[in-house]
Amino acid sequence: VISPFTDSIKSQYSNKNKIWKDPRILPDFELLTIKHQHSPGIDKPSQYSSWVEMIESIKNQMSSLDYDIVLIGTGASALPLIAHAKRSGKKGIHLGGPLQLLFGIKGGRWDNGPIGKHFYNEYWIRPSIGETPEKFKNIEGGCYW
């Protein structure tokens, strides 16, 4: 899984049978994660000098892992990451923002709609404080938080 919310995803995976009533939604698998930086408009400076450098680093991390399918929720940078997975003989699926929902992570975009009303329960969480940039509201009004 490649996402800015890897800490929350890892902590939520152990609750998968409490998040979803149907175990087919989030079945058992070996969870491997790669952290992706948030948008440059809201994130603190990173260890990368450019987005290209960050994507190349993530591709290198992908190449070092033994996986069958990668789930990605990273915006536009998902396209070169999926292409890399395919060139490596793997499968890549870009879920975008809704990737966090698969792991029971709430977001403002879904709070008052059918997802929030029908699926949220006491095991759903918000992204961790460490995954919440100071300027998170600059991304679509903070819809992922």
Regions flagged by a language model, labelled:
Residues V1, T33-I34, I58, G92, ...:
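Generic structural hydrophobic/aromatic packing signal, biased to beta-strands
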Residues P80-S88, G92-W145:
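C-terminal functional extensions of proteins
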Residues S8, K59-S63, F103-G104, C143-W145:
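Intrinsic structural disorder
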Residues S57-N60, A76, I82:
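Catalytic core segments in nucleotide and nucleic-acid processing enzymes
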Residues P23-F29, N60-D68, R87-K91:
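Secondary-structure boundary elements
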Residues T33-I69:
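A mid-sequence, solvent-exposed acidic-amphipathic segment
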Residues V1-Q47:
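Redox- and metal-dependent alpha/beta enzyme cores, enriched for Fe-S-associated oxidoreductases
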Residues P4-S8, L71-P80, G96-Q100:
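Gly/Ser/Thr-rich loops at beta-strand to alpha-helix junctions
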